[in-house]
């Protein structure tokens, strides 16, 4: 059960460069993989961290926090680049300014001095909207923990976010207000949370359970799911499948069952960025299954750092019904969350659920270097009739598919270029009728992805 009214979203932390000593424009940079692999295409909202409160001509406003990067670039440069590149990849993406939670420049600074709190909040709200308009951004995200949650009073909370909501609602286009608390606090006005914010994504990865937020007063109809794929995280934050299993089931509160309203993932660019970005793309496919009959593992596998294919599940009968790949990362940036030195990427199944399923493991030191088989016509349908896979050592897996009922058989072989191996697949499916009136998808065309 999942509604995800507010989408599948992620944060990006502009202070950090990965790999170390790279900058935004380095070909191997975590920022370039977001563009090259079209990771941004999987995000509804991008929270850009961290913004600070600064004085303005009248009251206060926001600016991106200061940090320097190799090559003389600044966080302002990075902000400009991200806004440009993410929207080129995904014209529909929405940008949230994520506010800093510690130090002297949190949202609590809006109320510095001895002015009238309502006037201070109104001035900030006006300046905030002007900043968002000038920079092509779509809203504000509140990381509620640490200094900001300790220095701002409950009354100030209500005044500030009411003023922001009122100013947002006066605009001709929609502006969004997001609340991402690490834990409940006494300074939170929960009536304001429920009435002023568009969505609420608790940071469950910090260990506070859902029940604590609901018991504190957050409406169950507002709740989203905060996830994280950084090293050190255990289940249910160790894979896209684990997060989706939690979210898709929804949750009970009182006697009712509720959907989570969004997923918000911290973040795109830690030292585990290849794992994070690829898992995010898989999570998007789980939440928004591709509607096309065409499939291509290439973008996800590239984002993951082209890890070896280490397990296959193949469904077959007369023909090749479905394939599903599992890849294992062993590099410095794709080794998962649990300190095992490996990161597991379980891709989506391509094809239907008919035929018998066989799962086999592929040793890391004996990668698949060739696929072969037959295509042809099966009861009038052009499809892949049979598939075999061959490892570097010469070991063969298969054949899968008996070719019974086929009218034609055409042999194919796809060997990997020297020094490369099979890391995924692309192709298409076709839906065919089955005996008894049902139908299923089978593999119509298939190509190996090499890296």
Language-model region placement:
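RTX-like calcium-binding, glycine/aspartate-rich low-complexity repeat tracts
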Residues: 1-2, 451
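Chitinase-like catalytic core of GlcNAc-active glycosidases
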Residues: 2-249, 253-260, 269-282
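Residues in well-ordered beta-strands of folded domains
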Residues: 11-13, 226, 264, 324, ...
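Glycine-centered small-residue hotspots that permit tight backbone geometry or close packing
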Residues: 89, 136-141, 262, 288-292, ...
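Cysteine-clustered segments with highest specificity for TGF-beta superfamily mature ligands
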Residues: 247-264, 412, 423-428
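Lectin-type carbohydrate-recognition ectodomains
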Residues: 283-451
